[in-house]
């Protein structure tokens, strides 16, 4: 219907001129004659080959070899017969096109008829006085319309017949190769000389070399060792994996080729693979693994081990720094019983000891008190001596009576003596430890050659009872009979709570030299 409307759009003069001025039916008739001659040639060759096969099977060549030869030639014989029939059909279709052209040429209004119609119409219009030619003019115009419709219908009919004839001509197929069933290597070579992909040919040659000719791949025929890819159904064999790899390679090559030429067909091809081809091979693999579970365990063990390693590394991201270990507090070091200098710190009372010779008489044993464990170290200068029994009335007269602590009861004399002996032993241990450390300490040597100048206000002088003799400033005499101080000595206050306010010093010291200040 569409073609008829297209032909109707043009006047009949155009169709008549094109149809009658073209090359005519000559070329189409020549093509029909050529197809007919080719069909007769194919028929003759097929007849000759059939006679030869019959003679081979019936003559002296009869036997398995003759039967194998006949079986190898039968596909080619069938192709010859089919090609002869196809050529005859093509010739017949072209002859039908020639007949349609002849019919269209006969039915088409000629250019002379169309010119006569136009001439008649012009004359009647020119002589149409007072409308006397109105009816003849209308008849002439109706005849022109008839020729218009006839030309369009003729062209539409000719087009339909020609298209149908051309479409019905069978396509030519390439002839099959005459091969025996065990001649796959020659088959592969002939394929290489054909239109196979060069990459596929290279892979086929590599497979053949690596396997020593045991794997023959024909990319064009889609076979491995003469069998199609789908003939290999056992994943437990190496040939199944080779066939699947080669099949996937060709499938993706075909998909890429179609993607550039016909994208719709390419995606249809991919859908067919996903729905029908790949599930079949996956089912074969799943069935084989179900029948051999030990292989599945062996295949999954490395993967599971890898996942365990990854999870172990992931645990490193959650490491929290451990809080610093707080060292346990060391036990309180035993501080030797050394009394501070008067005025440097507030000392506590120490156990009473026997007064040195020549010193003032000490208080009764009941007035002595024990010292605290944490006694500040004494400053340099005079030996630490304090006199007096603590603040008197005039020192802290405003202190409430309730805030004063009651004096402890008198200790046993034996306990006081034991405490004094323990303090002496402890002092000796401290001195021995200090002496050892002096021999092994790492210190920088001070290379000052000048005499050390004591700080201002400090006097580094004392009396020594051992070693090379007395040390200290001039005028100091050593008295071997002076006993070593044993602690804080407190003198008793009088009835007005006014005790001595000066420390008790050794009687051998020359106070006059000290008072001179040099």
Curated annotation (Swiss-Prot):
The keyword Secreted applies. Transmembrane segments: none annotated. SUPFAM superfamilies: PE/PPE dimer-like. Residues 177-197, 346-375 are annotated as: Disordered. GO terms for cellular component: extracellular region. GO terms for biological process: response to host immune response. It is found in: Secreted, Cell wall. Keywords: Cell wall, Secreted, Virulence. Residues 181-196 have a biased composition (Low complexity). It comes from the Bacteria. Gene3D superfamilies: PPE superfamily. The keyword Secreted applies. May play an important role in the persistence of mycobacteria in host cells. Belongs to the mycobacterial PPE family. This is PPE family protein PPE11. The lineage of its organism: Bacteria, Bacillati, Actinomycetota, Actinomycetes, Mycobacteriales.
